[in-house]
Amino acid sequence: MKKILLSQVWFFLSVACYAQRSYKDSIQNYLKNYVDSHEVVKGEDRKHLHFFDVDPKYRVVAKFEKVETAQWFEMPTSGKIKKVFKQYGVLSFTINDTLIKMNLYQSQGLMGSDQYKNYLFLPFTDATSGIETYESGRYIDLLTTDIKNSEVVVDFNKAYNPYCAYVSGVYNCPVPPKENHLMVAIRAGEKSYSKH
C-alpha cells in the first residue's frame, strides 16, 4: 500500500514539475521571440533588453467584471498626442497575499482595425517602477477572447516596456492611470533598458 501511495505522490510531483518546466520554457520562447522581433531595439542593442526570471506566481487568474457604461476618455501620453480609450472592465486577483484591482482598457483607435479590434490594454506601474523597471510603467496586452466565464489569465511574465523606454521624444506612450498604480512589486516581465 505504501509503495502505491509513494508512486502516486511521485507521479503527481513529476507532472507538476513537468508542467512548471513546460510553462517556463514557453515563456522563455515568448521572450526570445519578443527580443528577436523587436521593432525599436535592433541588432546589438538587443543585448540591453533584460527580464526578470520567469516566475509562475505572477501568472494569475483574474476575476473580470465588464463595465457596460464606460465613456471614452483621453489617456495622457508621454508626448503631446493623447490617446482615446474606454474602461473595458475591472480585474481582481491576489499577488503576495495582496488583493489587487486593475482597470482594463480598450483603444478607440484600434477598434476600427479587423486585426486589432479585440485587443485590450493593461498599463500599470508597481513598486519596481523607476528602480528595476521603466519608471513610467509597463504594459500587458490581452484579447477580448481571452476572457472566459468572467475570468482571464494575466501573465506579468509577459509585461513589456513601452517604446518610450528606449527612445525619448519620438512616441506617444500612454501613461498608466492612477487606478493601475500598484503598491506591490511585480518582479516579472521586462526590466529597465540598460543602454541609457
What are these regions (language model features)?
Residues 21-24, 28, 160-196:
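Extended, aromatic/histidine-rich regions of cofactor-dependent oxidoreductases associated
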Residues 43-45, 54, 85-87, 134-136, ...:
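Residues that act as N-cap/strand-start positions at coil-to-secondary-structure junctions
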Residues 1-22:
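Bacterial Sec-dependent N-terminal signal peptides
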Residues 121-163:
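Acidic, glycine-rich flexible loop segments
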Residues 21-72:
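Start-of-domain marker
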Residues 66-74, 82, 96, 142:
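Surface-exposed peri-terminal alpha-helical interaction modules
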Residues 52, 61-63, 94-96, 103-105, ...:
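A structural detector for beta-sheet-dominated domains
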Residues 80-136:
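Mid-length scaffold segments of soluble, non-membrane domains
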